[in-house]
Regions:
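Juxta-kinase regulatory segment immediately upstream of eukaryotic protein kinase catalytic domains
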Residues: 1-23
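ATP-binding glycine-rich loop module of kinase domains
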Residues: 33-66
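Short beta-strand micro-motifs within the conserved protein kinase catalytic domain, predominantly
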Residues: 84-96
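Conserved short submotifs of the Hanks-type protein kinase catalytic core
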Residues: 93-107
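Catalytic-loop of the protein kinase fold
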Residues: 143-160
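Conserved C-terminal C-lobe helix
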Residues: 265-278
Length: 295
């Protein structure tokens, strides 16, 4: 096996002022034109992200990296994001990099593994699940109140902390109220959690046209993520051999699997909230603020 790619040296040197001299640098991911590393030091840890200069999507990922940094700044000023989350950003000889504080948590899919078992129906698990959903919606409510949609709500962008709280990451695709300025066109995110109205808009417009995601689309994606990670099945069934546009055409119909037919055990409050989130008409979905009291 080859040696793991190293992060931008100038970024590591600069971040040492935040973490202290690195004691560990570990590659977390290397896919879709970008890489991420965990940099641990005596004073803390950060996630350093950089575009992959030799990747097919290097140019787009460079723009996305700059866009995410811009989004983090705006969301922080709007009070929708903890000011400690963003650490630093800059350029390097291969493009751009961005560093955010490390969040100690595991992706939603792994965290909810105990709930996917019939044995998950126990008194201690219900408030834990409700707490994850509530803290997730509280974060989205702050974004939505500021006029933003995260636009990439999905299991891998939601971490569950040891205390049972949801933490939202990855703001590169977010859609804000000032998106009249030049930006990377939003064309949906993870197919399986794409809201029907986003799927419809993507199918109806050229590939270089920006589709402005609204908060209601986040709510559908929230419901889809909880449905998927609790039941083990995606809410919209389709053949995995279909290409992305064909899958989006199925999603655009607005039909989902009945949750009661696939849930591992009965949890009426959670079921009702997820079902409401997956309403095909955006106007029929609850807001994030309304959801915070439903879990």
């Amino acid at each position: 096996m080859g040696q793991a790619p190293a992060p931008p040296g100038d970024a590591v040197a600069l971040l040492a002022g935040h973490t202290g001299e690195p004691t560990e640098i570990r590659l977390l991911s290397d896919r879709r034109g970008s890489r991420a590393w965990k940099i641990q030091g005596p004073n803390g840890a950060v996630v350093l992200k950089a575009n992959r200069p030799d990747g097919d999507e290097a140019r787009d990922k460079t723009a996305e990296m700059a866009q995410e940094d811009d989004h983090l700044r705006h969301l922080t000023v709007a009070g929708a994001l903890d000011p400690d989350y963003r650490v630093s950003a800059g350029t390097w000889d291969g493009g751009r990099w961005l560093a955010v504080n490390w969040i100690d948590g595991e992706p939603l899919w792994q965290a909810l593994a105990p709930a996917r078992s019939p044995e998950g129906d126990r008194a201690s698990l219900r408030p834990w699940l409700a707490g994850i959903a509530r803290t997730w919606t509280e974060h989205l409510a702050r974004m939505h109140a500021a006029g933003w949609a995260h636009a990439d709500v999905q299991p891998t962008n939601t971490l569950v902390t040891p205390g049972g709280h949801a933490a939202v990451i990855d703001y590169a695709l977010a859609c804000g109220p000032d998106d009249g300025h030049r930006r990377v066109p939003y064309r949906g995110a993870l197919t399986h959690t794409t809201a029907p109205e986003i799927a419809t808009a993507v199918l109806a417009t050229p590939a270089d046209t920006h589709v402005q995601a609204q908060p209601a689309a986040d709510i559908w994606s929230l419901g889809a993520s909880l449905f998927w990670c609790w039941t083990g099945q995606r809410p919209v069934p389709y053949d995995d051999d279909l290409d992305r546009l064909e899958k989006l055409a199925v999603i655009a119909k607005g039909t989902t699997t009945m949750l009661r037919d696939v849930r591992p055990w009965s949890f009426p409050e959670l079921e009702d909230a997820i079902t409401a989130c997956l309403a095909p008409d955006p106007a029929d979905r609850p807001t994030a603020k309304e959801l915070t009291s439903a879990w």
